[in-house]
Amino acid sequence: MTTTLKRPTDGEGSVQVHQDPSVNIEEETLVIAVYGKGGIGKSTTSSNLSAAFSKLGKRVLQIGCDPKHDSTFTLTHKMVPTVIDILEEVDFHSEELRPEDFVFSGFNGVQCVESGGPPAGTGCGGYVTGQTVKLLKEHHLLEDTDVVIFDVLGDVVCGGFAAPLQHANYCLIVTANDFDSIFAMNRIVQAIQAKAKNYKVRLGGVVANRSADTDQIDKFNERTGLRTMAHFKDVDAIRRSRLKKCTIFEMDDDDEAVQAVREEYLRLAQNMLDNVEPLEATSLKDREIFDLLGFD
């Protein structure tokens, strides 16, 4: 169960969604939460990273935490029903569900779940995420999983959508080399700073996406203590893979650009498995970002 607590210690003056300890994910599992500005390519990054982990022989579970429920369609090649949709069909009697009702097998055996969310303007997405993890534990679906990836809605870092941070070992932030994306990244760093006081989550690093250059990201990283873990340029093959509803690992093997992107995802996955050193980054004030970024 999830409850709302007043003024907890993990965010000054904030109201956060606090998870029941019984829904914690096993310690030996690598849990990654992927955040970033809305539309920056988090789902593409998450799905290709899941595919890369599977290529390295890992058992992978990807959990989409967006009411749009489009996180996993390149893995499953279709839009799958959400946990909320399935629970509504059984009047929220979760004991009536079977794993195959809400977990779908995707590319190379990656297990896919879409938590969904409440209707617009109602409810709490964090509650839905918590209930999804609880349901997975009830069916013992996390016991044989090596890697769990949470693909989280936009750059929303309220108590609800910060809920995946309570399960994660690392947070990866997807950004482009522009002001708006980096501004959103700074807000996410602030959320990690708050959650890290009471939870195990730490910053893993930055994924530069859809960017030929990284000069602005590099400025921000140097100032805050972040690092770039992977760099994906604006490669047309990535866009085409979304249109084909597949991962980059299912695209043309003879395309050199495809091969380069695959290698970068495999390198990122291996680095995360090698117990990447967590970062102690410090967020900037809004005015400091305005002064920092841009051309001299």
Curated annotation (Swiss-Prot):
Pfam families: Fer4_NifH
Gene3D superfamilies, per the entry: P-loop containing nucleotide triphosphate hydrolases
Enzyme Commission numbers on file: 1.3.7.7
Keyword Metal-binding included in the entry's annotation: yes
Record flagged with keyword Amino-acid biosynthesis: no
Molecular function as annotated in GO: 4 iron, 4 sulfur cluster binding; ATP binding; metal ion binding; oxidoreductase activity, acting on iron-sulfur proteins as donors; oxidoreductase activity, acting on the CH-CH group of donors, iron-sulfur protein as acceptor
Keyword terms: 4Fe-4S, ATP-binding, Chlorophyll biosynthesis, Iron, Iron-sulfur, Magnesium, Metal-binding, Nucleotide-binding, Oxidoreductase, Photosynthesis
A biological process term (GO) from this entry: light-independent chlorophyll biosynthetic process
InterPro entries referenced in this protein's UniProt entry, alphabetically: NifH/chlL_CS (IPR030655), NifH/frxC (IPR000392), P-loop_NTPase (IPR027417), Protochlorophyllide_ATP-bd (IPR005971)
Binding, [4Fe-4S] cluster: 124, 158
Pathway: Porphyrin-containing compound metabolism; chlorophyll biosynthesis (light-independent)
Annotated catalysed reactions: chlorophyllide a + oxidized 2[4Fe-4S]-[ferredoxin] + 2 ADP + 2 phosphate = protochlorophyllide a + reduced 2[4Fe-4S]-[ferredoxin] + 2 ATP + 2 H2O
UniProt xrefs under CDD domains: Bchl-like
Necessary cofactors: [4Fe-4S] cluster
Record-listed Mg(2+) binding positions: 43
Residues reported to bind ATP: 39-44, 68, 209-210
Cofactor note: Binds 1 [4Fe-4S] cluster per dimer.
Subunit structure: Homodimer. Protochlorophyllide reductase is composed of three subunits; ChlL, ChlN and ChlB.
Membership in a protein family: Belongs to the NifH/BchL/ChlL family.
Known function: Component of the dark-operative protochlorophyllide reductase (DPOR) that uses Mg-ATP and reduced ferredoxin to reduce ring D of protochlorophyllide (Pchlide) to form chlorophyllide a (Chlide). This reaction is light-independent. The L component serves as a unique electron donor to the NB-component of the complex, and binds Mg-ATP.
Protein name: Light-independent protochlorophyllide reductase iron-sulfur ATP-binding protein
The organism of origin for this protein: Synechococcus sp. (strain WH7803)
